[in-house]
Amino acid sequence: MSEKNPDADIGRALADITEEAAALILPLWRSGLTVHAKADESPVTEADRAGETLILKRLAERFPGVPVISEEDASEFGTPDEIGRRFFLVDPLDGTKAFIRGDAHFTVNIGLIQDGRPVAGAVTAPATGQSWFTTAAGAVRRELGGPDEVVRARAWPDGEAIALVSHTLKPEHAQALIARYGFTHKQPMDSSIKLCMIAQGSADIYPRHGPTMEWDIAAGHAVLESAGGRLATPDGAPFAYGKASEGFKNGWFVARGAP
């Protein structure tokens, strides 16, 4: 992501939408709302559905004609057999399990895909009031009501590197990741906040050797690249979006800071 990306500034408009959805979701956090199970047995709540309804409405108003693939809609009705060159990926509440536990690591996400790449995106963490989004000048972080702050991913440190990992990562798998990628510390964390932490230089690597969906990471991937970081397959190959024939499922990936 760079100043040559004409779509990067769309991230600001997307952040307006994710922040509006966050304001809708936040009162439902720690409210004892009912949790339902989706077809794949993953949890879904009223907050997921309310956030998605608002986001879909706002995207239709601001970007008419651009297709949208969203998590809850896909869960209920399935994903399309094909998608065009340009479309949005929406996860209205990434980190639903954290949300249910009362943890703060859940996010609202919108990513714009063009020709298989994330070209704009916004991520908002309702519990902290923080947003990260793409601009033509790079990745930006802002607190609710505060000024924009340009953020940059850091280079791999000479000392101890920090990895962000899933709460469900088993110890034996953690040791295998340490051996492969050479980080020193690991910090459990949910949702796309992991990508934003690397984008702002607070961590160094997020190795994901497990299942995710495209909407889980598209927005955070856009922010990370805009901040000078990168996300690729474990072998370093570019990470593609729009995998309609695979149900928009991701393979393994590794997110890192600056080269």
Predicted segment positions?
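Residue-level signal for inorganic ion chemistry
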Residues: 25, 48, 59, 96, ...
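Glycine-rich active-site/cofactor-binding loop and its immediate structural neighborhood
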Residues: 84-127
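N-terminal subdomain of lithium-sensitive/metallo-dependent phosphomonoesterases centered on the IMPase/IPPase/PAP
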Residues: 1-93, 176-179, 237
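Oxyanion/phosphate-interacting regions
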Residues: 1-16, 175-180, 195-259
